[in-house]
Amino acid sequence: MYIEVTGYGPALVLIHGWAMHSGVFAPLVEQLRAHHTLYLVDLPGHGYNHTTLTPLALPHVVHAIAAATPPAVWLGWSLGGLFALHAAATLPQVRGLIMLAATPCFVRREDWPHAVEVSIFTQFAEDLKQNYTETINRFLALDTLGSTYAQSELRQLRQILNARHTPNTATLQAGLELLAHTDLRRAVIDLTPPSLWIAGQRDRLVPAASIHAATALAPSGQTELLTITGGGHAPFLSHANQMTAALQHFIATLP
């Protein structure tokens, strides 16, 4: 699996969200590459890895990334957070975990009320079969909904998406299945490495309340929470400086 490597310093793995590719992290890469060696992952079926045979499944993807990277901090945005969290729960080489607009359980359950209804993801899966482009555009709009800079972020996401190979319908449906049916709350309870959880105050896809609830599950004393005021689901586009400072501070404090 192809992983782009850039920069110099302590290793940081970055994993993107649904339908996107690692180019979405450009605002962070610009500031972090002077201080960190960045491993920019395109998930199977996405971007530069659009032809890889690795299944879009947690253990397969995590194993492939781990085989190509040194001990590192793992950052996952949105869907990418599930892969980063699974890695942190199963691999000793994960020095720290950064969950960016990501939660161990993306859908509402009886004992997990601060999340979206599962129908959001199942409906997107159905709509993909009818109109691929319109469905992608609606999801990107949901990514930016509520953000102080929603229109600017939406333009950026559309440009970024089209800069590399776009994933096919089967790949996108596999990602939606992960979002709809994965529950890694037990992994949070048992976390060994320190973790930083970043929420967008105005995120409509992963409400800040769900990330706050996730941090309450994590071991006390090694868990940090940052809420980006005015941020939506992609706060690294609108608040890159604040994000960069938070990431660098967290990584600098790791043992």
From Swiss-Prot:
The active site is at S78 (nucleophile), D203, H233. Pfam families: Abhydrolase_1 (PF00561). Substrate binds at W18, S78, L79, F139, L140, A141, L142, D143, H233. It is found in: Cytoplasm. Keywords: Biotin biosynthesis, Cytoplasm, Hydrolase, Serine esterase. InterPro entries: AB_hydrolase_1, AB_hydrolase_fold, AB_hydrolase_sf, BioH. One of its GO terms (biological process) is biotin biosynthetic process. It is an enzyme of class 3 (hydrolase). GO terms for molecular function: pimelyl-[acyl-carrier protein] methyl ester esterase activity. It catalyses: 6-carboxyhexanoyl-[ACP] methyl ester + H2O = 6-carboxyhexanoyl-[ACP] + methanol + H(+). Its EC number is 3.1.1.85. Gene3D superfamilies: alpha/beta hydrolase. One of its GO terms (cellular component) is membrane. Pathway: Cofactor biosynthesis; biotin biosynthesis. The physiological role of BioH is to remove the methyl group introduced by BioC when the pimeloyl moiety is complete. It allows to synthesize pimeloyl-ACP via the fatty acid synthetic pathway through the hydrolysis of the ester bonds of pimeloyl-ACP esters. Belongs to the AB hydrolase superfamily. Carboxylesterase BioH family. PANTHER family: AB HYDROLASE SUPERFAMILY PROTEIN YCLE (PTHR43798:SF31), MONOACYLGLYCEROL LIPASE (PTHR43798). Monomer. NCBIfam families: bioH. HAMAP family: Carboxylester. This is Pimeloyl-[acyl-carrier protein] methyl ester esterase. It comes from Xylella fastidiosa (strain 9a5c). The gene is bioH.
